[in-house]
Amino acid sequence: MTVKECYEKMGANYENVLSRLGGSEALVKRLVLKFLDDASYQKLEEQLLNKNVEEAFRAAHTLKGVCLNLGFDNLFTVSSDLTEKLRAKELDGADELFEKVKEQYEITVAALKNLD
């Protein structure tokens, strides 16, 4: 699967990120593959299980920023919603929002693992 096809599969904004990175598909590919090593999702999941709202907020905020920079609109939107919930130091409803993050994260990772 090409990088563009990968972005289409996950519902992300390939053209925007390609433009921001000077039109280099090789650079986009190199950066998005690094996402697979990013630990912010795992940290978010762990901190939510521990009911640590401050650390969960930091992890959600980091994930949101990475997704914004990589043009992963699908994952950015849901991680942004969770970030705002946690910014208010609220865990009430965070589990439901995390399930949306988890769904989009899994879609994103599955697409990235199919890159040529």
Residue ranges and their predicted role:
Residues 1-58, 62-116:
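Two-component system phosphorelay core
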